[in-house]
Amino acid sequence: MLLLLRATITLIGGLMTDQNSSEHVFAKLSPDFILSAIEDNGLHCDGRILELNSYENRVYQIGIEDEQPVIGKFYRPQRWSNEQILEEHTFSSELLAAELSVVAPEYDEAGQSLLTFEGFRFALFKRKGGRAPELDRDENLEIMGRVLGRIHNIGASQTFNHRPTLSLQSFGFDSVEYLCEKWIPSELINSYQSLSSDLLSILEDRMASVSGLKQLRVHGDCHIGNVLWRDNMAHFIDFDDCRTAPAIQDIWMLLSGSREEQRHQLMCI
């Protein structure tokens, strides 16, 4: 336990340092720059800008003259390729076309959803209001389950060609290799590698024991922060982490409490 605690503290410290050093990639996003990017695409801003919560990207609510504000999402450079972002847009637009309540990007007159301005890629979205869902109510969980079921039915109808796949290799072996290269103190490397190897071996056996595991297009980051509750309905936002994965990837982050409580929640969904 002490080993894991020390490794975790070191990792968090390193990640904070790395995050601070990478802040320069967004340093250019001044209010003037943001307004210029929006107006370059034909909208007339009224000068109001409100930064919204986002971990990887930068997201702003921008006021528009005589119209409703828009949401602008500026993508973190080098995180996704253009093809991957466009697959995100296509998937959410496909869901919207099927009358599912998701927030999909807006398309300009040329039919483009991925916009650029002075080296930054961004997309515009309609502003949608709502509150966090109350998942301690069974009826709300059942609504979530029905909507997710429809999302997954459509997700299974086609495949991603460029978005990543959730796998033990990418989320397990590759992550361990990355941490050992840079983040784990040298005196803890051997112990960490031994522990990681044991855990990954167990996971390999578990994965091998599951036959016919179906992979499909999923939201990928389905926690309550990416769900707006309005008019007794769940509205899904931010498909930035959509990927190919089992359907459970969109369910487990909605569960909380004791094992018994989580089982009940899972049954409702």
Model-derived regions, located:
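Structured catalytic core of nucleotide-sugar glycosyltransferases
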Residues: 102, 112, 229, 254-255
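Active-site acidic catalytic loop and adjacent metal/ATP-binding pocket
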Residues: 56-72, 105, 204-251
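Active-site activation/catalytic loop segments of kinase-like enzymes and analogous catalytic loops
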Residues: 248-269
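Short Pro/Gly-enriched beta-strand edge/turn motifs at strand-loop
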Residues: 39-46, 199-210
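ATP-binding pocket architecture of kinase catalytic cores
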Residues: 64-160
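Conserved NTP-binding catalytic cores of kinases and kinase-like/nucleotidyltransferase enzymes
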Residues: 2-109, 231-233
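A cross-family kinase active-site recognition segment
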Residues: 134-191, 215
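Conserved protein kinase catalytic core
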Residues: 79, 132, 227, 244-246, ...
